[in-house]
Curated annotation (Swiss-Prot):
Organism placement in taxonomy: Eukaryota, Metazoa, Spiralia, Lophotrochozoa, Mollusca
Natural source organism: Conus magus
Keyword Acetylation found: no
Function: Iota-conotoxins bind to voltage-gated sodium channels (Nav) and act as agonists by shifting the voltage-dependence of activation to more hyperpolarized levels. Produces general excitatory symptoms.
UniProt-recorded name of the protein: Iota-conotoxin-like M11.5
Gene Ontology CC, one term: extracellular region
Family: Belongs to the conotoxin I1 superfamily.
Length: 42
């Protein structure tokens, strides 16, 4: 599904769709950050 993500509340189907949004909903600059992923949101 899609969830609001990031400062601008964009809808994202994938974490990478909004600057690698992490599970916490915080955008990080790289998927190498702990908790970041390019997998789909459930």
């Amino acid at each position: 599904g899609h969830v609001p993500c990031g400062k601008d509340g964009r809808k994202c189907g994938y974490h990478a769709d909004c600057c690698n949004c992490c599970l916490s909903g915080i955008c990080k600059p790289s998927t190498s950050w702990t908790g970041c992923s390019t997998s789909t949101f459930d």
